[in-house]
Regions:
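ASCE RecA-like P-loop NTPase motor cores
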Residues: 1-146
């Protein structure tokens, strides 16, 4: 990465969430380069309106970890009922988390920006359509997979 981009990175773990957000806001207010990089916890409860957030990059679809004992018990219950736990539990849960992550970008009617999804499963797997359909009515551009 170019040095100016690296210098502008604020990475989760390099400080408290609050400290990183305050530094990000300060940099933007002063016209400096700032890129806030975080994991799933940054997709919830984060309010960065206007120029504080113009691009959200989602690296992977937000499916829950499959070895969680509570999720396993719920999945077993659904299977015992003859239902499909992946499509009835996992996909709707991931859709909700995806909407929350995209919601970091658009906080009011004047906000605009770009959401980039890097996980190709959104277009290559059958459940990808359900995830896309759960999102607000964004313009959708799908780049060719390489």
């Amino acid at each position: 990465l170019p040095e100016d981009v690296v210098d502008g990175l604020l990475v989760q773990g390099d400080g408290s969430k609050q400290a990183l957000i305050l530094e990000h806001r300060r940099r933007i207010d002063e016209g400096e380069c700032s890129h806030l990089v975080g994991l799933a916890s940054f997709s919830e409860g984060l309010d960065l309106p206007g120029d504080y957030c113009r691009h959200v990059v989602i690296v992977k679809l937000p499916f829950a970890v499959p070895d969680d004992p509570v999720d396993q018990a719920i999945a077993e219950w659904a299977e015992a009922q003859g239902r499909n736990p992946f499509y009835e539990i996992s996909v709707p849960d991931a859709a909700l988390k995806l909407v929350q992550a995209c919601g970091r970008l658009i906080r009011n009617e004047r906000d605009y920006g770009t959401v980039t999804m890097l996980d190709k499963r959104i277009v290559t797997q059958r459940y990808g359509r359900a995830l896309i359909d759960s999102l607000p009515p964004f313009r959708l551009d799908i780049a060719p997979l390489r």
